[in-house]
Amino acid sequence: MAGFNIKHWFADGAFRTIIRNSAWLGSSNVVSALLGLLALSCAGKGMTPAMFGVLVIVQSYAKSISDFIKFQTWQLVVQYGTPALTNNNPQQFRNVVSFSFSLDIVSGAVAIVGGIALLPFLSHSLGLDDQSFWLAALYCTLIPSMASSTPTGILRAVDRFDLIALQQATKPFLRAAGSVVAWYFDFGFAGFVIAWYVSNLVGGTMYWWFAARELRRRNIHNAFKLNLFESARHIKGAWSFVWSTNIAHSIWSARNSCSTVLVGIVLGPAAAGLFKIAMTFFDAAGTPAGLLGKSFYPEVMRLDPRTTRPWLLGVKSGLLAGGIGILVALAVFIVGKPLISLVFGVKYLEAYDLIQVMLGAIVISMLGFPQESLLLMAGKQRAFLVAQTIASIGYIVLLFMFCHLFGVLGAAFAYFGGQCLDVALSLIPTLKAFFQRHSLLYNAAGEKS
């Protein structure tokens, strides 16, 4: 029964580290969520519902292209860089960062070209006129900074979650401040696009500066250089890992980042605006799971997957997140409607109907958050990819079908179904890996042998 004793849980140093790092990130995410609501509130009040929807679609389009193309280089740095640092192997860590940096540069270039090239073909479906089209094209130049996650991987590997927290508070502050100015002076659509653009640009630059400073402090020089194929040769299984996680994340983005765009295509910009408001509440409510996930992955990568310790750590973290999820869902249920009315106005109250449907998905997604990290730790990224593929195909089918049948409320039902599929299908390979854990490989150095 010791595994279910709460005091015993906190005797685990890794569990305490996860809680500590989550607290760092949580301190900034509470502020970020409030500032994000302020920015959306100003945009909602400063424009018509249709133009607010167009703004949301422009931002979601750029993020969707970024999410679809980019490699999950932060996972690469944590997967291979954390063991290298643990074993005092700076050269191997330098190889990992160089490979990761090169992937960011190449994928960022492909993403910006692809995003701008696709825009003329999608502009009519997205509801863009001539002015908003060019502003959307300008916003696409942010895609490389959105597609780069090497700096966050470095900061997680060196346990500098405080710097991540600082960046995560600064970007929404700048966005909120710019949105207040655009609303107060009635700068309209162009003003909000510029405000959001500048905040993203500054936020992305901060990550790179923090990461470079931490590398210098540890005397790890010349890590940020283009050396794609040579550095990869020193990292066993690197290409298999990055392609599996990239495809899995691209599929994930189709289910999440692209959802707002798809709703806009099927139902129009106004419906996309309502769905974005609901997703903002969902993302804010799901923040604890995201924070725990960012802290959980580096910790389990320091543990031997052949033992029960990382798996029990996953159970404890999932139960903790699920309990928090229930409390958060109840809070959103109680304050959601008056908060939407206060922040956005009564014309957006329909978003609360969507939120009510999506509350169950919050708890389910929180309970299942450790599964991805456990599968990556076990080297089962392809099994995770298969689960993501099936769940996402099911979600996209549900989204189109339910939107046609039930309107914008159908998008909420589809999202709930997609979250259930995701957790259920990922649980199957996770349980299989646990019962076969004695056959798993544990390569602490992360080097090619």
Model-identified regions with their sequence ranges:
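Transmembrane helical elements of multi-pass membrane transporters/channels
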Residues: R20-L40, T170-K171, R175, F192-L215, ...
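Hydrophobic alpha-helical transmembrane segments
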Residues: I57, S132-A137, L166-N222, G394, ...
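Interhelical loop/hinge segments that connect adjacent transmembrane helices in multipass membrane
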Residues: A2-I18, F189, Y207-N256, P305-R309, ...
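Interfacial segments at transmembrane-helix termini and the short loops linking adjacent helices
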Residues: A11-F15, L119-L138, I334-V363, L409
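Membrane-interface junctions at transmembrane-helix termini in multi-pass inner-membrane proteins
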Residues: T73, P144-T170, F185, A190, ...
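Signature of the first transmembrane helix
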Residues: F4, F15-Q79, I112-I116, S240-A270, ...
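Helix-loop junctions and terminal segments of transmembrane helices
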Residues: K70-N87, A157, A278-R306, L374-M377
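Membrane-water interface segments that mark the loop-to-transmembrane alpha-helix transition
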Residues: R16-S32, V58, D67-P120, D129, ...
